[in-house]
């Protein structure tokens, strides 16, 4: 059997709580209940009402009906004791719920025959918790003796004064002295209560410790097999990227960071002359956008400054490019037109943004509506012509050929 050296996980603690195995500092709960009762007793328990009832019966001199007499005493008892009992019950229930983290132990209500097992009973009898309870009992005996000694030194005059007290004040004095004795005992027992709670917490976690195999098995049950989880993640990302793929294919170009940010830009002056952010992805999705754009022939421009600026100034997808970034976007569009003209071997186009209505303006790049078409490169394209992917808007290469690959464009 493997040695249990690992701390219990959160799931292990939750499952144990459902079975009733929670950290319980019962003595602290008892301390709260006793302190609440001692402080509330003088205000809630009115013994003068009992004395007044005796006086009323004696003054009438009549023989009361036994049934009515018992019913009257029962009502009087409930009126006096009910508020006190309810307050003490609430004072005991609230700390218990806090210790169990408001978890109801449903499984602990079931009848369990294993609790009658004599072998387990002997193990509990000679367990660390039993030894702790025995030491705690001895400490409480010492605390009680200390409490009596301190109480006698402090209030012996009041105790002996009870013999000379008036009957009307006798009940009140007894209540006051009893409350003082109880509070003094709780104060002296406080160190023992704290020590008991610390030891109980240690034993609770010691009983729920796990071995390494249990931790791995629980991780597999809660998180699933690593290979299956990775496959699910890939499928999920693939399903989510269908819309993004369509937006990439319809973009005029992709500006990259080069690996952490990918921004798709779409321009159609016939509709609105302002560039439009069609794709806005980061990290792994940005790399996927770049790969898909290169596969479909959509230009990819690696410009760190422009990509970061658009990402910062255009916080949402399907929003217009910020006024501060329009100049940089238009420069890229003009450069793309020059690259296409150089690939065709013709004169450079006019210095304006290409539109989706003019697909013939860019050889090697499919129009926004058909970016992945098979005729992305026309038959009359010069040998060696290439789509303007991962290029740089530095202008066409000499002699009207394809532009030289100058690497990333970092503004």
UniProtKB/Swiss-Prot annotation:
Topology in membrane: Multi-pass membrane protein
Transmembrane segments: 28-48, 80-100, 137-157, 175-195
InterPro entries associated with the record: BsaZ-like (IPR006307), T3SS_substrate_exporter (IPR006135), T3SS_substrate_exporter_C (IPR029025)
GO cellular component: plasma membrane
Region (Disordered): 341-411
Record GO biological process: protein secretion
Primary location recorded for the protein, binned into one broad class: membrane
Subcellular location: Cell membrane
Keyword Cell membrane on entry: yes
Keywords of the record: Cell membrane, Membrane, Transmembrane, Transmembrane helix, Virulence
Coiled-coil stretches noted in the UniProt entry, renumbered to this chain: none
Domain of life: Bacteria
Biased composition (Low complexity): 370-404
Similarity-based family: Belongs to the type III secretion exporter family.
PANTHER family, sorted: FLAGELLAR BIOSYNTHETIC PROTEIN FLHB, SURFACE PRESENTATION OF ANTIGENS PROTEIN SPAS
Record's function text: Part of the bsa type III secretion system, is involved in the intracellular replication of invading bacteria inside the host cell. Probably necessary for the lysis of the vacuole membrane and escape into the host cell cytoplasm.
Protein's name according to its UniProt entry: Secretion apparatus protein BsaZ
Originating gene: bsaZ
């Amino acid at each position: 059997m493997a040695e249990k050296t690992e701390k219990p996980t959160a799931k292990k603690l939750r499952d144990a709580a459902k079975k009733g195995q929670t950290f319980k500092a019962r003595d602290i709960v008892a301390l709260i209940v006793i302190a609440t009762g001692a402080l509330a007793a003088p205000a809630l328990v009115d013994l003068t009402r009992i004395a007044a009832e005796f006086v009323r019966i004696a003054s009438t001199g009549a023989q009361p009906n036994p049934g009515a007499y018992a019913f009257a005493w029962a009502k009087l008892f409930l009126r006096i004791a009910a508020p006190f009992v309810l307050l003490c019950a609430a004072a005991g229930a609230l700390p218990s719920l806090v210790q169990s983290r408001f978890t109801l132990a449903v499984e602990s209500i079931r009848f369990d025959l294993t609790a009658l097992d004599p072998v387990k009973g002997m193990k509990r009898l000679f367990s660390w918790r039993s030894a702790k309870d025995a030491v705690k009992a001895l400490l409480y005996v010492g605390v009680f003796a200390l409490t009596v000694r301190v109480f006698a030194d402090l209030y012996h005059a009041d105790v002996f004064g009870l013999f000379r007290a008036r009957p009307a004040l006798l009940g009140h004095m007894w209540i006051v002295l009893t409350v003082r004795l109880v509070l003094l005992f709780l104060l002296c027992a406080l160190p023992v209560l704290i020590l008991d709670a610390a030891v109980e917490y240690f034993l609770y976690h010691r009983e729920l410790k796990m071995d390494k195999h249990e931790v791995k098995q629980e991780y597999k049950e809660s998180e699933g097999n690593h290979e299956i989880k990775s496959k699910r993640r890939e499928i999920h990302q693939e399903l989510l990227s269908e819309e993004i793929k369509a937006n990439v294919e319809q973009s005029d170009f992709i500006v990259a960071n080069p690996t952490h940010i990918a921004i798709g830009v779409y321009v159609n002056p016939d509709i609105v002359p302002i560039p439009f952010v069609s794709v806005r992805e980061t990290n792994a999705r940005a790399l996927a956008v770049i790969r898909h754009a290169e596969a479909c022939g959509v230009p990819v421009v690696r410009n760190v400054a422009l990509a970061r600026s658009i990402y910062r100034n255009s916080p949402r997808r399907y929003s217009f490019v910020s006024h501060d970034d329009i100049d940089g976007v238009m420069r890229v569009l003009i450069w793309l037109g020059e690259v296409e003209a150089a690939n065709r071997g013709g004169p450079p186009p006019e210095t304006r943004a290409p539109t989706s209505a003019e697909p013939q303006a860019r050889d090697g790049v499919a129009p926004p509506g058909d970016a992945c078409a098979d005729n992305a490169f026309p038959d009359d394209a010069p040998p060696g012509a290439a789509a303007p992917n991962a290029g740089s808007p530095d202008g066409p290469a000499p002699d009207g050929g394809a532009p030289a690959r100058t690497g990333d464009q970092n503004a």
